[in-house]
Amino acid sequence: MSKIFDLFIIGGGINGAGIARDAAGRGLSVCLADKGEIGGATSSWSTKLIHGGLRYLENYEFKLVRESLKEREIVYKIAKSISKPIPFIIPYADKIRPAWLIRLGLFLYDNLGGKSNIPKSKTFDLKKKFPNILKEKYKTGFQYFDIQIDDKKLTKLNAQDAKRNKAKILEHNKVKKAEIIENEWVISLENGKKIKSKVLINASGPWINETLHKNIKIKSKKKIRLVKGSHIITKK
């Protein structure tokens, strides 16, 4: 236990692995531990989409969308082998939103993030592409693109890159306890080993509250609120 790491990360999901990659790439000494395998839980159960958040434009959250689109482009650039543009179709009916508003929103979505290698949005002939499926009022639509990615592979690649920069990646190593002793974090693993670190990061995903209270023994007035999304998948 002689070595003191700059950073110890609990959790090997995309957040933990991403932090490890970034920190190790900046020259910090990093150790990451996960109770299972890297990317083996929530980060492999996602929608597998990297998107800019088109719907946030209606709430005038332009800064958020711009940042998300820039990050989408970065991910697509560095992980092109495991990602691809995927089209989305918005059926148009004049009683829902005016066409000019949708066009404006998609124009902003195409350009807010700066130069992009992802296809631009365009109008779409619904009747020609999907005859006898949609109601008569849905004749025209709009097509835009986001990125679909292998989420688990992305997480593993982040961890591998961190490891190449001398980060220590510990799979199947559950953190039993973490406590501050003489201004340093002492992390006890379930296998009996102890690790020292200057900084501790709790990136345990949906187990973050449990880890905070049971393993780190810190009482917090605020709790992380979990969010779940659902997608309906049908045959073509």
Report residues per predicted region.
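Central beta-strand plus flanking loop segment that forms part of the substrate or channel wall
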Residues: 50, 219-236
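Flavin (FAD/FMN) cofactor-binding and adjacent substrate-gating region
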Residues: 92-171, 177-183
